UniProtKB/Swiss-Prot annotation:
Underlying gene: yheG
Molecular-function GO terms, alphabetical: oxidoreductase activity, acting on the CH-NH group of donors, NAD or NADP as acceptor
Protein name: Uncharacterized protein YheG
Cross-referenced InterPro entries: NAD(P)-bd_dom, NAD(P)-bd_dom_sf, Polyketide_Oxido-like
CDD domains: BVR-B_like_SDR_a
Domain of life of the organism encoding this protein: Bacteria
Cysteines engaged in disulfide bonds, as pairs: none
Length: 206
């Protein structure tokens, strides 16, 4: 099964590749902006390019059955621009399954109905620009007919996978304050295998 991976050289992307590359069920191809010595992929499994460019997104997604995005916001509108390209190509190529990494800021507030966490005091972040960009992506996916999942980790320190953490649909697990990069990648791999959270944002924390 061919998987198109965008954001492979980021922290979660690299950790996911380390775990998933050994699974023979999946044939992973990654779009990368520059050669990256640490990626456990052969050169014929990587495409040099930029997720902001439609033609590069088309190239990596050719014949893919599942798309995974670990793209960050990059301080601009890269995330929403890339997602518009991804959705366009998925529709064109009849690809249904998309898993993407978001942020806990776009989960529902537990205490203020109708608001995202980043719009309330539940979020500790002072800057909301990145969360707004992630929210734009969520709104795009919500309006689509895709089988999507948005994984929404809270504070994301480096760390290896323990496999022990809490998940909750559309809200952050009560009292959750952090989740490691390794465990976020572990849950991404689990969701790839199980498809348990199709059509949901998933709050992720210890």
């Amino acid at each position: 099964m061919k998987i198109a991976l965008l954001g492979a050289s980021g922290r979660v992307g690299q950790a996911f590749l380390t775990q998933a590359a050994a699974d023979e069920r999946f044939d992973i191809f990654a779009l990368i902006r520059s050669q990256h010595a640490d990626l456990p992929l052969s050169k014929d499994r990587t495409v040099m390019g930029n997720a902001r460019r439609l033609e590069d997104v088309k190239k990596i997604m050719e014949n893919a059955e599942i798309v995974i995005s670990c793209l960050g916001t990059d301080g601009d509108d890269t995330l929403s621009t890339a997602m518009a390209h991804i959705l366009s190509v998925m529709e064109e190529q009849h690809i249904k399954r998309l898993i993407t990494i978001g942020t806990a800021g776009i989960l529902d507030s537990r205490y203020e109905p109708g608001k995202y966490r980043f719009e309330t005091n539940e979020s500790k972040r002072k800057q909301t620009r990145a969360a707004k960009e992630h929210a734009k992506v969520y709104e795009m996916l919500k309006e689509s007919s895709l089988d999507w999942t948005i994984i929404c980790p809270t504070y994301l320190p480096d760390g290896t996978a323990t496999g022990v953490y809490r998940t909750e649909r559309n809200v952050l697990p009560e009292g959750g304050t952090s989740i490691s990069v390794g465990d976020t990648a572990d849950f991404l791999y689990r969701e790839l295998v199980t498809g348990e959270y199709v059509g949901n944002r998933v709050g992720l924390a210890y």
